[in-house]
């Protein structure tokens, strides 16, 4: 009897997939460069704190870029939705590296000291909450989760707004005074959140602002 053989269809990469990989590659360049600066003694008098700070700063930057996708589309018509998931995941990876640096290099895996910091130092508490909120977003940033969760997926990913607000507050509270840098980032975050609140009203006035679908946070 002749055995029936099935033919497997080879998965062909989607058009423009290389752009996503290029984005991921470029996204990790700051981490590699910062690690190089630290390894070669170019991060100043307190390299651990500087390394930790820069990783956290890049996490906030990528969160801002993630939320900028929608205003850019609304105001210019340029659609970057396919890159939003990658930007959101990069933000999570940097936030995780930021916390890992604090936990391993700063505190030396002293769990008692880490827990004490989280409980007693408000800016660390807020930072930890923000990181915790990003975890389910990163874990569900895939097509399977979108299909499985349905409408709940969009509701879940609205947590990104709380996470980015907490990240901005964490940055502001981590400095003894308020220099320009954290204030500028906080202002950008505030503007993005205000845009999100005003967007439904703007869409009723300008039909062009109505997107085909509401993609939140880390979704492609």
From Swiss-Prot:
One of its GO terms (molecular function) is electron transfer activity. Binds 1 FMN per subunit. Binds 1 heme b (iron(II)-protoporphyrin IX) group per subunit. It is found in: Cell inner membrane. It is a multi-pass membrane protein. Coiled coil: none annotated. Belongs to the MsrQ family. This is Protein-methionine-sulfoxide reductase heme-binding subunit MsrQ. It comes from Brucella canis (strain ATCC 23365 / NCTC 10854 / RM-666). The lineage of its organism: Bacteria, Pseudomonadati, Pseudomonadota, Alphaproteobacteria, Hyphomicrobiales. The gene is msrQ.
């Amino acid at each position: 009897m002749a055995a029936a053989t099935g033919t497997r269809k080879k998965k062909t990469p989607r058009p423009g997939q290389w752009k996503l990989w290029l984005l991921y590659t470029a996204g990790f360049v700051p981490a590699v460069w910062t690690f190089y600066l630290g390894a070669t003694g170019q991060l100043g008098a307190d390299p651990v704190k500087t390394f930790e700070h820069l990783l956290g700063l890049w996490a906030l930057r990528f969160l801002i870029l993630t939320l900028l996708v929608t205003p850019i589309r609304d105001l210019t018509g340029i659609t970057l939705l396919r890159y939003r998931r990658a930007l959101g995941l990069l933000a999570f990876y940097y936030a995780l590296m930021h916390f890992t640096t604090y936990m391993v290099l700063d505190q030396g895996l002293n769990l008692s000291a880490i827990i004490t910091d989280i409980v007693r130092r408000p800016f660390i508490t807020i930072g930890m909450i923000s990181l915790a909120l990003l975890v389910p977003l990163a874990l569900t940033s895939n097509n399977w989760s979108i299909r499985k969760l349905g409408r709940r997926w969009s509701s879940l990913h609205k947590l990104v707004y709380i996470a980015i607000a907490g990240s901005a507050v964490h940055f502001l509270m981590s400095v003894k005074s308020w220099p320009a840098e954290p204030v500028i980032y906080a202002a950008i975050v505030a503007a993005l959140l205000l845009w999100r609140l005003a967007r439904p009203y703007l869409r009723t006035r300008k039909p062009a602002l109505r997107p085909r679908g509401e993609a939140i946070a880390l979704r492609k």
